[in-house]
A protein has these predicted regions:
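N-terminal beta-strand motif that seeds the catalytic metal site of vicinal oxygen chelate
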Residues: 1-21, 57-64
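Vicinal oxygen chelate
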Residues: 1-3, 25, 29-38, 46-52, ...
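Non-catalytic surface loops within mature trypsin-like serine protease
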Residues: 16, 66-68, 103-105
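Short Gly/charged-rich anion-binding patches and loops
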Residues: 22-23, 71
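Mid-chain, well-packed structural core segment of small domains
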Residues: 58-88
Length: 115
């Protein structure tokens, strides 16, 4: 089966909370988006997540969403990709919610999540 993937958001690493807020406000202003505060990050609409401290990926992360996460993981494994199992998050029912691919792609980590 071939799974479908859509861009969920782009996470951008910053040095601290002040830089994250500054960048989120700038991106919100440029693209007419609503800024939003989060615990670990500041957001510019639904598209940009400005991390309050450096996280996975030299530059940040790219989040992709898919309707069938388990099937997508199996498809990507068959393509030779590995996963960072330390990042796997599960819902209350024990189903996988999201996980990062191992390594970086153009300086970005890639986060796969359930749509």
């Amino acid at each position: 089966m071939t799974n479908t993937f859509e861009l969920e958001h782009i996470g951008i690493n910053t040095e601290n909370a002040q830089e994250a807020e500054k960048l989120a406000l700038l991106l919100s202003s440029i693209f007419n988006l609503k800024p939003r505060h989060g615990q670990k990050s500041e957001f510019a609409g639904d598209y940009f997540e400005c991390m309050k401290s450096p996280f996975l990926g030299k530059n940040g992360h790219i989040a992709m969403k898919t309707p069938d996460l388990e099937s997508a993981v199996e498809e990507l494994k068959k393509k030779g990709l590995d996963f960072n199992m330390d990042t796997a998050a599960y819902d209350e029912e024990g189903k996988l919610k999201n996980i990062y691919l191992a390594g970086e792609f153009g300086g970005f980590a890639i986060h796969i999540m359930r749509k």
